[in-house]
Amino acid sequence: MVLAPLLLGLLLLPALWSGGTAEKWEETELDQLFSGPLPGRLPVNHRPFSAPHSSRDQLPPPQTGRSHPAHTAAPQVTSTASKLLPPVAFNHTIGHIVLSEHKNVKFNCSINIPNTYQETAGISWWKDGKELLGAHHSITQFYPDEEGVSIIALFSIASVQRSDNGSYFCKMKVNNREIVSDPIYVEVQGLPYFIKQPESVNVTRNTAFNLTCQAVGPPEPVNIFWVQNSSRVNEKPERSPSVLTVPGLTETAVFSCEAHNDKGLTVSKGVHINIKVIPSPPTEVHILNSTAHSILVSWVPGFDGYSPLQNCSIQVKEADRLSNGSVMVFNTSASPHLYEIQQLQALANYSIAVSCRNEIGWSAVSPWILASTTEGAPSVAPLNITVFLNESNNILDIRWTKPPIKRQDGELVGYRISHVWESAGTYKELSEEVSQNGSWAQIPVQIHNATCTVRIAAITKGGIGPFSEPVNIIIPEHSKVDYAPSSTPAPGNTDSMFIILGCFCGFILIGLILCISLALRRRVQETKFGGAFSEEDSQLVVNYRAKKSFCRRAIELTLQSLGVSEELQNKLEDVVIDRNLLVLGKVLGEGEFGSVMEGNLKQEDGTSQKVAVKTMKLDNFSQREIEEFLSEAACMKDFNHPNVIRLLGVCIELSSQGIPKPMVILPFMKYGDLHTFLLYSRLNTGPKYIHLQTLLKFMMDIAQGMEYLSNRNFLHRDLAARNCMLRDDMTVCVADFGLSKKIYSGDYYRQGRIAKMPVKWIAIESLADRVYTSKSDVWAFGVTMWEITTRGMTPYPGVQNHEMYDYLLHGHRLKQPEDCLDELYDIMYSCWSADPLDRPTFSVLRLQLEKLSESLPDAQDKESIIYINTQLLESCEGIANGPSLTGLDMNIDPDSIIASCTPGAAVSVVTAEVHENNLREERYILNGGNEEWEDVSSTPFAAVTPEKDGVLPEDRLTKNGVSWSHHSTLPLGSPSPDELLFVDDSLEDSEVLM
């Protein structure tokens, strides 16, 4: 022990002898720079040096004011002495940090450098072998004292993400030697994260297919459950990644997967597995252009049946009654959606329809449309052309036969005669046009002792047809010439006189038949009325025509002819409109029992109003059906609200069997029903973007209309988007009161007989005992809001009508649509309370929607709107369907934070502080130095009592500031809410300090 200092002194003696002055300067400079105690014994007024992180940071510069005459010798002393200085190393780090996403974390590394070291660079931070640049993550603090300087580099990460996982460590250079700290492993844990979700596919019926789902932690492992139509497919979980093999489906289904780990569960998006079917028939078949022998047709393909269209066929048949009904079929590719039909007859009528096919089969044909070809030039020349010379008049007589009617391709307007005269040294070509009235012409002789060549062509408005074969005749100087032979003899027509005579006799026979039939009809009329009126009496008859009748008795007789009740007659007697004032147009839409037609209603001032006419489709309708049809009109008679469709009148006409048939006249709605409008905006070839403010306005319009009806004690009982109409100004009107009822006593109506009802819009109590109240309409209004938000989607996809009651009874409700605000979903969800008394009134709903609309910004373009897709209730990250989490929490007194900076410290003291705001927190594991800190004490849960709605506070989940209950969102077979674990969803900060 005594020899060691002596040997060390002998080794240092040469260096001290040669560089004593420089060494003294070095010690003086360091004493001045790092004067004061170490952090373990810092004075009260001591303040450390702080500097942001930089890979080029140097130690603080020495203080000025002292001279150092031996400055030039310092490098030699340092270079010689550095080989004998003790090694410098970083203190032990925390080692391993485990925390949840979105928390704040801080950690550090520290080092003690004696005054004997002079060439020291700053501390740099590295992650996974790459240097972290930038000064916003770390701060370096210096603590100088008499013996040296202690350096602490702090590193912080705000709201950690999974990308922050990795190994962090410090680096610095001391006397050109690189020193590396122990690594600090940061592990960010959270709910499972999907890296591959199931994808929607279109499959053939009863054909197997696969779905893949893959999610990762940490923490691992991640288990996968598959869900089909809200029911689990596999009872035992599968390790991620998981591949589900479905043997085959017969109907459309919705699949999703649940990823579970120790932090909770995450639910993937639901994907639709569609069954391929035959396509729908094409629509909007139009004629783009037509010529004499071709027609250009276009169409819009129908729904492809979840399989690409392969080709289409155009079916063409003649529309003339005399045609044989044969159909010509032209096949073409599915795209482009147009085809030119050729080889058609000119000036003919055709019926055209289109059908398309996919891999499953052919669609039904589209509705037949009528098309016509235009007039064309004749396709053949006139026949039987003869030419002879009339020598007395010095003219040529030319005769011919008209082309066949089917080959004329139009209406003949005349003929063009071309005659060429040739003689020795003379050539003359002339042409003349004659009318179509005759089939002969005369032309003067132009040249004698010459040859004349004659050709004739027929003319229509479509053009000039081909010329006939030439007919030559020789014109002598003074001699008689017989007529030239026929140029184009008609086959089978050797004698045209017989044909003309036959046609003449036929016309005479037809005329005789018409005369006889008229005489017989007149005789029958005279026999029918007999001699009731003599010629003298008939002069005393006054003929008049009533312009309009206001006789109440006449109206009663008209309504009585329908056989309806007297009460209904009294309700409708003042709204019956004369049939002559109504002009019907095209059919706008058809249902199972009726149709809606476009019409024009003449007003008293001579103008006309465009209206919609609702008729009964069937001719063999029963008396009860007529009563129900007119009862709907009676319901609307007294309505006067801008958001409720009003009745314009009732009209009666005779059906094809001579039976009176009622028609209800309503205002014309330009945009049709709301459901079709929303559906086309989402599924059309060019989707129309609808602002959220517009959707809210639709809901407010319906709420105002239903508020008006409920205040008048009317139950609609069939409120849905399909029964709401859109006016020209985009105002929604509540319509279709076929199931409406007036409540005269009490506040409910019980349905007596069984009728067709919209099951997916009916409240749960109405499904159970067929009792309807205004709160039943509130339930349907919530479903209608869901339809509007999803832009026309069908409620409860994958759930059959006969399953609806059990589905609702187990607490299931419509899920929150994508891009739906939480506040909006709150409003619609309140409409589906199991207890009707807990549902809001339409007045409250209107006020809530108006308040929500006022809080939203003005409508913007689609590109500038950002939607935040919140998680669905069933997949909320606050629910964990797995084993209980281990109650290991790091809960250390913040006053015990100690920075161990003394160079002689044998063990680095590691302390951690975790700020907790939630009693239910996940586990933290922190390893520091040679000690492992574990606080196994868990905070007990406070006693809770049910709230006023019977739901315990722990059964509620706060998401985006809104409280949700699990009772109405858990799938069938799930554990009770008391068995569910709540995964931490807070954003409280947590920091770990060395």
Swiss-Prot record:
Domain annotation Ig-like C2-type: ranges: 75-181, 192-268
Swiss-Prot/TrEMBL GO biological process terms: apoptotic cell clearance; establishment of localization in cell; lymphocyte activation; natural killer cell differentiation; negative regulation of cytokine production; negative regulation of leukocyte apoptotic process; negative regulation of lymphocyte activation; neutrophil clearance
GO terms of molecular function: ATP binding; transmembrane receptor protein tyrosine kinase activity
Membrane topology type: Single-pass type I membrane protein
Glycosylation sites noted in the Swiss-Prot or TrEMBL record: 91, 108, 165, 202, 210, 229, 289, 311, 324, 331, 349, 384, 390, 437, 449
Signal peptide interval: 1-18
Residue segments, region Disordered: 44-78
Cytoplasmic topological domain residue ranges: 519-994
Annotated positions of the Phosphotyrosine modification: Y744, Y748, Y749, Y867
S-adenosyl-L-methionine as UniProt keyword: no
Keywords on record: ATP-binding, Cell membrane, Disulfide bond, Glycoprotein, Immunoglobulin domain, Kinase, Membrane, Nucleotide-binding, Phosphoprotein, Proto-oncogene, Receptor, Repeat, Signal, Transferase, Transmembrane, Transmembrane helix, Tyrosine-protein kinase
Domain Protein kinase as annotated: residue spans: 582-852
InterPro entries: FN3_dom, FN3_sf, Ig-like_dom, Ig-like_dom_sf, Ig-like_fold, Ig_sub, Immunoglobulin_dom, Kinase-like_dom_sf
Active-site residues (renumbered): D718 (proton acceptor)
Transmembrane segment boundaries: 498-518
Extracellular side: 19-497
EC numbers for this chain: 2.7.10.1
UniProt xrefs under Pfam families: fn3, ig, Ig_3, PK_Tyr_Ser-Thr
Oligomeric form and interacting partners: Interacts (upon activation) with TNK2; stimulates TNK2 autophosphorylation. Interacts (via N-terminus) with extracellular ligands LGALS3, TUB, TULP1 and GAS6. Interacts with VAV1 in a phosphotyrosine-independent manner. Interacts with TIMD4; this interaction enhances TIMD4-mediated efferocytosis.
UniProt protein name: Tyrosine-protein kinase Mer
Species per Swiss-Prot/TrEMBL record: Mus musculus (Mouse)
Taxonomic lineage: Eukaryota, Metazoa, Chordata, Craniata, Vertebrata
Gene name of the record: Mertk
